[in-house]
Amino acid sequence: VFAQTLHAAQDYAAKKGAIFIPPYDNLDVVLGQGTVGLEILDQLDDVQNIIVAIGGGGLAAGVAVAAKLKAKANGRKVKIYGVQSEHAAPYVTSLKKGKLTEVAITPTIADGIAVSKPGRVPFELIKKNIDKVVTVSENEIAKAILVLLERAKQVVEPAGAVGVAALIAGKLKLKGKTVVILSGGNMDPL
């Protein structure tokens, strides 16, 4: 779904003479998304871990670079963890191979992060700044959405709930103050 939407937007921009702004494979976009990492450290100066969903990689790359630079400037360290759906995990494969790798994706409820190939710009930044990337299953994502709704009264789309899914499923065993970035509230009705 994401690839189709991306191509449709590029085609539309070309036909209409509009400006196409890439959603993640653009340094300016990545830097803009990095402000999320800065805000986290501004508000929680003792945070030790940040968990972020990874699709194309823009948000994760921006958060990782900005948070690590700010923490270092303050004489601290912060670890950044990325999470992908096991149905669309190009970063896991690409990081293992050390190069951009396109993977086959299968349908996932986390369609907002269902990309088949990492962005070139974010991949280089993630390779250097993300401490670990894990995957979560469809059932783990669904459980996280339910937990967020029942306990936190938050409607979070599947793509944004993967970080909580990783924690609940025990994919990340972290010590210290941890922040999970919850992004997106786009939920299709049941």
Question: Over which residues does each language-model region extend?
Answer:
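PLP-dependent amino-acid enzyme catalytic core
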Residues: 1-190
